[in-house]
Swiss-Prot record:
NCBIfam families: ATPsyn_F1gamma (TIGR01146), PRK05621.1-1 (NF004144). Gene3D superfamilies: 3.40.1380.10, ATP synthase, gamma subunit, helix hairpin domain. Keywords: ATP synthesis, Cell inner membrane, Cell membrane, CF(1), Hydrogen ion transport, Ion transport, Membrane, Transport. One of its GO terms (cellular component) is plasma membrane. GO terms for biological process: proton motive force-driven plasma membrane ATP synthesis. One of its GO terms (molecular function) is proton-transporting ATP synthase activity, rotational mechanism. Produces ATP from ADP in the presence of a proton gradient across the membrane. The gamma chain is believed to be important in regulating ATPase activity and the flow of protons through the CF(0) complex. It is found in: Cell inner membrane. This is ATP synthase gamma chain. It holds the Pfam family ATP-synt. It is a peripheral membrane protein. It comes from the Bacteria.
């Protein structure tokens, strides 16, 4: 039977760990609420610009932007959004597994793949396995700024503009609710043509002033930026939700483990007392 002193030490250690996990759970709840508010605040802009782009894909444009053109696929790029910190359950692992499966399908067709990475977890993982990384950024924090993301967005857009990439995907976690976060891979370039059936009966053309090419260049760049930013904010909400659930599970596991150890401790203490009584009785009998 384990020594009572050792068991007591383990119980104290688990109690201290429980305090930490409980505190982290409460912090995650607070951060998740703030991130959800930020996500909802940025959603109207993302939805409106998305709707405008959908109309543009159906319009008779004076200038047909390259972002609407499908071309033969030789190279594709992924913008991968992960977390900077751990203790978020299987959030990053599930995302990376889905991405690796998708990359494998392209590799089997002889397609070259290049990555732009957001977050320490993606940077560490994909550099470790030897993936071709052409841009990366870390330290997004809990209050993401578009200025922090502009660099990798420009790198990928320039690669697409120069026909170095033929498709561009955005990889992130979709926040469904507190207990559900779904990894998703969305094509952002060329602009997908699905889900536009409902607009066909009510679309319109725009009048461009002063120049359609200039306006479309700016508008489509803003669209890509909004897509990436919205995904980063949504991924942060997913991170905090996953961390909250993970820390809650850790706290509950600590409670269960402490109960089990207390039972073991009481048995060990009881055996120790019984042994001492037996020794006293044996000593008294000898006298």
């Amino acid at each position: 039977m384990s020594n009572t002193k050792e068991i007591r030490s383990q119980i104290i250690c688990i109690q201290n760990t429980k305090k930490i996990t409980k505190a982290m759970e409460m912090v995650a709840v607070s951060k998740m609420r703030k991130t959800q508010e930020r996500m909802l605040a940025s959603l109207p802009y993302a939805e409106i610009i998305h709707k405008v782009i959908k109309h543009l894909t159906l319009g008779n444009l004076e200038y047909k932007h390259p972002y609407f053109h499908e071309r033969k696929v030789k190279k594709i790029g992924y913008i991968v959004i992960s977390t900077d910190r751990g203790l978020a359950g299987s959030l990053n692992i599930n995302l990376f597994k889905q991405l690796l499966a998708n990359m494998k399908k392209w590799n089997e067709q002889g397609i070259t793949i290049e990555l732009a990475l957001v977050g320490c977890k993606a940077v560490n993982f994909f550099n470790l396995i030897g993936s071709k990384v052409i841009a990366q950024v870390t330290g997004i924090t809990d209050d993401p700024k578009l200025s922090k993301l502009i660099g990798i967005i420009k790198v990928m857009l320039q690669a697409y503009d120069n026909e170095y990439l033929d498709k561009l995907y955005l990889v992130s976690n979709k926040f469904v609710n507190v207990i559900s976060q779904i990894p998703q891979i969305c094509q952002i370039l060329p602009i997908p043509i699905e889900d536009k059936i409902d607009l066909k009966m009510k679309h319109w053309d725009y009048i461009y002033e002063p120049d359609s090419k200039l306006l479309l260049n700016i508008l489509l760049q803003r669209y890509i930026e909004s897509q990436v930013y919205q995904s980063v904010v949504e991924n942060l909400a997913s991170e905090q939700a996953a961390r909250m659930v993970a820390m809650k599970a850790a706290t509950e596991n600590a409670d269960t483990l402490m109960k089990e150890l207390k039972i073991v401790y009481n048995k060990a203490r009881q055996n120790s007392i019984t042994q001492e009584i037996n020794e006293i009785v044996a000593g008294a009998s000898a006298v």
